[in-house]
Regions:
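Hydrophobic alpha-helical transmembrane segments
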Residues: 1-46, 50, 57-70, 75-222
Length: 222
């Protein structure tokens, strides 16, 4: 399932572009349209990834050993760090999609698709061989250490190629997308060290981080 995650990202990216186009076409404020698009993405994934984002940031924000960080992550509610992260990350996504919606460029919808798909490629990187689970149970145990590095690279190549068509500056899209994936890999490495391994929440964090960085970066090409 993880190996095919980018296919889900492509489907969700197309759906997001359609929602953004449809809502702005009927006259909705582009920033409200961006917010609705982000909400539709969260609804389409049952909020799993945004929940993982909040839990991971709460875990990173606490003191103590990995066991304590995992306890905070699994406490069942979003703490102040998690709430702030949701506000910042989802807010940046919404505003970025709003900016893309009003861009007078044929590349704007490709940028939405690339942003969403990039998050799923980041998940494949996060599950690459050598990254172990933080617990023998849970979703992380099912997917950690499961993907060869070449699988993530294979998905990265078409994504980066597509990103060249996501802005009017052909070089900017690949630079933004590759940078977002690299930052995600480094952040996952830190999370694995901080939490004592990979879990499902970290995947949500990696995904939302990459979507946010890519969407924000691609607005620079407008």
């Amino acid at each position: 399932a993880i190996a095919a995650a980018p296919l889900t990202g492509i489907a969700l990216g197309i759906a997001a572009a359609f929602v953004l186009w449809g809502t702005t076409s009927i006259g909705l404020n582009p920033y409200l349209a961006g917010l609705l698009t982000v909400g539709a993405l969260a609804l389409g994934t049952r909020g799993m990834h945004v929940d993982g984002l909040a839990d991971s940031v709460d875990g990173l924000g606490c003191y103590g050993p990995p066991e304590r960080a995992r306890e905070v992550m699994h406490s069942g509610g979003a703490g102040p760090f998690g709430v702030a992260a949701l506000f910042i990350f989802l807010g940046l996504q919404s505003v970025s999609f709003g900016v893309l919606a009003v861009a007078d460029s044929p590349t704007q919808w490709i940028a939405v698709l690339v942003s969403v798909a990039a998050g799923r490629v980041a998940v494949v990187f996060a599950c690459r061989r050598g990254i172990l689970a933080s617990s023998p149970s849970g979703f992380g145990a099912l997917v950690a250490d499961s993907q060869p590095l070449w699988a993530a690279i294979v998905w990265s190549v078409p994504l980066i190629v597509a990103s060249a068509f996501a802005t009017d500056r052909w070089w900017l899209g690949p630079l933004v997308t590759a940078s977002a994936l690299l930052i995600s890999v480094l952040c996952v490495r830190h999370c694995v060290r901080r939490f004592g391994g990979l879990n499902g929440d970290v995947l949500g964090f990696a995904l939302e981080l990459t979507v946010t960085l890519t969407a924000v970066g691609l607005t620079l090409g407008l």
